A protein has these predicted regions:
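Short glycine-/small-residue-rich Rossmann-like dinucleotide-binding loops
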Residues: 16, 59, 77
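A short, well-ordered alpha-helix in the C-terminal region of glycosyltransferases
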Residues: 124-138
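Short hydrophobic beta-strand element within catalytic cores of glycosyltransferases
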Residues: 56, 72-83
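Two-component system phosphotransfer/interaction surface
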Residues: 108-120, 149
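C-terminal alpha-helical cap of glycosyltransferases
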Residues: 137-154
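Acidic donor-binding loop of glycosyltransferase active sites
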Residues: 46-62, 71
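Short alpha-helix at the nucleotide-sugar/activated-sugar donor binding site of glycosyltransferases
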Residues: 48, 66-67, 72-74, 94
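Donor-nucleotide binding loops and adjacent catalytic segments primarily
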Residues: 1-53, 86-90, 98, 102-111
Length: 154
């Protein structure tokens, strides 16, 4: 966290309940106003809107949201999921140059460097944003509801 402060990076950190107290302690220890923690962010679209770079797990719902948002993304797939599906999700975006992948086991050593490198590369930030935005499934709700209605009619 100290390095974020040194680089004048502002962080909106959704910690989850289990890490919330520890995160508050860590931030208090470095006395940084630029880092805020939340056990859960109810209006995530506001946090996404404020972000220049988003760091996220790689679940299907998160990736769907990130495609709509169209911001540069660093994905850290959870290793604690069935059939390593988050890694596969993340890798599919990486293969389309739409995200950066950092393995969970490497995150403590590599994540900060990746954030700083990305922040200092506006060309890559723009490229990642454009590529992930292209993956947005437009009108998904209409497609799903039409499909469901067609199933009911059968």
């Amino acid at each position: 966290l100290e390095i974020f402060k040194q680089h004048n990076l502002n962080i909106i950190w959704q910690t989850g309940k289990s890490f919330s107290e520890k995160a508050h302690e860590l931030i208090a220890a470095i006395n940084s106003r630029g880092i805020t923690t939340h056990s859960f962010i109810k209006e995530i679209e506001l946090a996404y809107g404020l972000a220049d770079i988003i760091v996220s797990r790689a679940g299907a719902i998160a990736i769907s949201e990130l495609c709509v948002v169209g911001k540069p993304v660093i994905l850290i797939p959870s290793p604690n999921v069935a059939e390593n599906h988050q890694y596969k999700n993340a890798q599919s975006l990486v293969n389309k140059n739409a995200a950066i992948l950092v393995k969970d086991s490497k995150a403590s050593n590599k994540l900060v460097d990746e954030i700083i490198k990305l922040q200092n590369n506006p060309i890559l930030m723009k490229e990642l944003s454009e590529n992930i935005k292209r993956m947005e499934f437009k009108n998904a709700a209409n497609v799903i509801s039409d499909y469901a209605l067609n199933l009911i009619k059968k």
